[in-house]
């Protein structure tokens, strides 16, 4: 059912962002072929949560609070990075971000948005060279492009790329 739903949605519009839950990884390849934007592995997530809680006391409560939309004082979120910081360092952005109240910068989410759009733009950019070896190298990078790739606490010299968002922990008002 899940695979058919994603196929139907993507047939209507490739730009619609789709997220699907999988209980069994054996269907993963079908969802990837259907251009599913995000695949959530419920069992894998549960196993990791259980393993993490055995090592770090209270981890399940922390994660539940961060992911819950109606409980807790804070939540994980992403916000757009102003254009003037694209091409600058994470350290520069982190210093400027310190001025925001009620938010803590914890990382960067690279290549955000529709995987179809991200890959088309990356492909166009990769083809802007007349050097064949550079072109091949660029195309290999596009093939390995990971959409919505989180980088938690990157080094200060990390260069902020286009289509990235800041991962933040924000205090809820109210």
Description of each model-found segment:
Residues 1-174:
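Cytosolic regulatory regions of ion transport systems
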């Amino acid at each position: 059912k899940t695979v058919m739903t994603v196929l139907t949605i993507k047939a209507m519009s490739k730009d619609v962002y789709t997220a699907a839950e999988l209980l069994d990884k054996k269907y993963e390849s079908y969802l990837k072929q259907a251009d599913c934007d995000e695949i959530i592995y419920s069992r894998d997530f549960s196993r990791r949560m259980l393993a993490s809680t055995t090592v770090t006391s209270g981890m399940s409560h922390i994660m539940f609070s961060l992911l819950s939309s109606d409980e807790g004082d804070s939540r994980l979120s992403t916000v757009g990075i102003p254009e003037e910081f694209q091409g600058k360092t994470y350290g520069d952005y982190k210093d400027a971000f310190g001025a925001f109240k009620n938010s803590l910068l914890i990382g960067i989410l690279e290549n955000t948005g529709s995987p179809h759009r991200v890959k088309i733009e990356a492909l166009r950019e990769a083809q802007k060279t007349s050097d064949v070896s550079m072109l091949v190298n660029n195309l290999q990078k596009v093939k390995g492009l990971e959409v919505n790739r989180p980088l938690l606490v990157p080094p200060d010299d990390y260069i902020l790329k286009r289509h990235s968002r800041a991962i933040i922990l924000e205090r809820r008002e109210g």
